[in-house]
């Protein structure tokens, strides 16, 4: 089995056996509202995102934001082979206010 085939098999198993849903649910449950300073984005990265990335072989670095102490940047890098093409992706860890009180009784923005 090629490394690519192994990776596809692993990803399929992770998704089909509920690992993806479990991990995503745990990430969604963390309130990282950018307007609410009591939720620390740096802690979210350190406690939730970085462990997942390190498990996949990434080197991670939190970079301070000169405009806002609360909104830091996470830089993660994984070089599998210098001869391979580079893939760049971008995301963010904060969300807008969840407005929990506006959701229907059986729904919440954090589940």
Predicted regions and their residues:
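Acidic/His- and Gly-rich active-site-bordering loop/insert found
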Residues: 2-111
């Amino acid at each position: 089995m090629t490394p690519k085939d192994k990776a596809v098999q692993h990803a399929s198993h992770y998704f089909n056996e509920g690992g993806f849903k479990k991990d995503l649910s745990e990430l969604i449950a963390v309130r990282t509202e950018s307007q609410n300073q009591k939720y620390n984005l740096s802690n979210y990265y350190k406690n939730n995102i970085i462990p997942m990335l390190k498990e996949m072989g990434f080197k991670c670095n939190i970079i301070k934001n000169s405009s806002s102490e609360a909104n830091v940047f996470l830089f993660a890098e994984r070089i599998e082979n210098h001869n391979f093409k580079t893939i760049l992706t971008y995301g963010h860890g904060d969300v807008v206010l969840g407005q929990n009180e506006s959701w229907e009784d059986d729904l919440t923005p954090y589940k």
